[in-house]
Amino acid sequence: MKPLHYTASALALGLALMGNAQAVTTIPFWHSMEGELGKEVDSLAQRFNAENPDYKIVPTYKGNYEQNLSAGIAAFRTGNAPAILQVYEVGTATMMASKAIKPVYDVFKEAGIQFDESQFVPTVSGYYSDSKTGHLLSQPFNSSTPVLYYNKDAFKKAGLDPEQPPKTWQDLADYSAKLKASGIKCGYASGWQGWIQLENFSAWNGLPFASKNNGFDGTDAVLEFNKPEQVKHIAMLEEMNKKGDFSYVGRKDESTEKFYNGDCAMTTASSGSLANIREYAKFNYGVGMMPYDADAKDAPQNAIIGGASLWVMQGKDKETYTGVAKFLDFLAKPENAAEWHQKTGYLPITKAAYDLTREQGFYEKNPGADTATRQMLNKPPLPFTKGLRLGNMPQIRVIVDEELESVWTGKKTPQQALDTAVERGNQLLRRFEKSTKS
């Protein structure tokens, strides 16, 4: 009979080996997807975890995009950052300039996982790539463009063709007046006013938002959205607001709820709002392209993306990064990227996901579901319509919101408000430029 202490030692060793064999690498993933979108994020994570028992993706909703970005950077400074942080597109320059990130192409390379960067739609991947090397710094995830949602039932009641949404902003103003006259509470409201009414208005109508090709060619860019075309557009919305044909309902996505609960007959909002509209709208609705300015030469041009990408944070161990690479690879697989696109309304981020969705007949069964993609690919992007890469852009958006609100409340003229927004925004750009050179 073996001595008892040998048996106990063997038992302890066995338990330790079992523990190691069953060890699971936990990978925190902080995001800003709520409602139906949050459910889809959870579903993707659960499926990955089931297929990869050595890893556990733990998605956590950390508030809206601004709140999540702030929480992620603050957590990095205290050594408690998540492995994956979802950051909205205007936070790209900030993340690039920070020392908090590990480029995704490095993550894949070190994990020994083949990663084809060319699989992503160029208009999307170009937004998140290093302008010097061309390599992806973050992985595209929930990319979107603004679209026009409209209530077909309300259109019929107002004597409008439910299959013909307004094509121009001038048409939209006319439609909204008719909808109001028919008894609808709100003819038109807009979500994300800075992104839609200035950033995308500029690109869609072939206008620069800032110099240096919207910042892609250097941090010394200056804002240029106070030109006559943009001022005229804001003045049109101001006039609609005075008549009650445009309702300002908030800075974020508040207009989506106003739309699906039947208060507003039309809204311009993210294509990613489709999941919630599909779930909650109790009426027939349509999806149209963003209106363009009837007076703009060669409009419409191409939409620029919104949404967010996934950034990998510094300071994690090798096993965590291997799990991160596996998860990002999982998200990019055609069947997963196509499902995310189809269920949420976000763009198909890879060519294969778009092809698979088309082959499955999804667009035929769901008219309008490809609207965001068609807008993005409407024309080859001009150097100043491929996106924005401006430092401190989240803070600049706040300034734009404040100044536009001063128009809606009658405190400033459109020219005064946009001039002030440009002046205040340029101060932030110079501050960012200085910080990148120090």
UniProtKB/Swiss-Prot annotation:
Residues 1-23 form the signal peptide. Keywords: Periplasm, Signal, Transport. PROSITE patterns: SBP_BACTERIAL_1. Sn-glycerol 3-phosphate binds at Y65, E89, S144, S270, G307, Y346, R397. One of its GO terms (cellular component) is outer membrane-bounded periplasmic space. It comes from the Bacteria. It is found in: Periplasm. InterPro entries: Bact_solute-bd_prot1 (IPR050490), SBP (IPR006059), SBP_1_CS (IPR006061). The keyword Mitochondrion does not apply. GO terms for biological process: transmembrane transport. The keyword Signal applies. Part of the ABC transporter complex UgpBAEC involved in sn-glycerol-3-phosphate (G3P) import. Binds G3P. Belongs to the bacterial solute-binding protein 1 family. PANTHER family: ARABINOSE-BINDING PROTEIN-RELATED, SN-GLYCEROL-3-PHOSPHATE-BINDING PERIPLASMIC PROTEIN UGPB. The complex is composed of two ATP-binding proteins (UgpC), two transmembrane proteins (UgpA and UgpE) and a solute-binding protein (UgpB). This is sn-glycerol-3-phosphate-binding periplasmic protein UgpB. It comes from Shigella flexneri serotype 5b (strain 8401).
